[in-house]
Amino acid sequence: MVEEPTIAVYDSQSHEYHRAFQVFLDHTDQKLKAQKWLTDLIDRLPSRRVFIDAGAGNGKVTAWFTERFGRTITIEPNASLRSELKRDCPAAEVVPERILDAKVGAAGDLILCSHVFYYIDASEWLPNLQRLVSWLSSSGVLVLVVQNHDTDCMRMLEHFFGRRFLLASFARQFQKGCGESYQVRVETVPAQVETADFASAYTIAEFMLNLLPISDPPARGALEEYVGAHFARPQGSFRFSCDQDFVQIWRRG
């Protein structure tokens, strides 16, 4: 009996991950909308001395904002991503550690943690969040960026693995648990993936499923059927939502 092919499984250090991520970037407005939202926030900051990018990846997002701050500190444990980070952000200080192990030695006016919590086990969300807010300056803001739980992508994740990411709800629980020492605000910004061909839509869907560790990958045919049934448009293109939550946390005055 021939086994049915399964979806590809890869980690964030692999060539396959980077290739699929680029296909995603080429077919979404998510990053441009994030850039605009963050630019508007930075314009309103009372101080722009220190920018901390926790989980900076390859530095593409970091590079948008380094010139807006007097000092930029990046945290990135992935060696392959760090090489790109150093190339694209030569003026930034690079801390090659996980968030929980990092020592930054500065208070951040903006601390950004963008699409990182997917890769952190839920049991470690609280200590990671506590570490991040401990780096805030008195007037600083922490921004956690994560895909909204009610997008087409998250519904697909729940369909195949029974899970969605509920970071915004977790942040509100954190606020209550801290005796209201922190203010939390969540803003959802719509975003879409749109492709003209099935192959790109499938690659992006497969990439989204790889946000979680996959011990028992679903059949490739099952994902192909899902993409066709849920994301296909009448004119032959494919569209699915990937709205972002911008979770803002700052100290109460």
Please provide the spans of the model-predicted regions:
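Conserved class I S-adenosyl-L-methionine
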Residues: 1-46, 48-57, 141-168
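Class I SAM-dependent methyltransferase SAM/SAH-binding core
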Residues: 57-101
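A conserved beta-strand element that flanks and buttresses the S-adenosyl-L-methionine
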Residues: 112
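A short, conserved alpha-helix within the catalytic core of class I
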Residues: 120-131
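Short alpha-helix
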Residues: 163-179
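Conserved Class I S-adenosyl-L-methionine
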Residues: 184-253
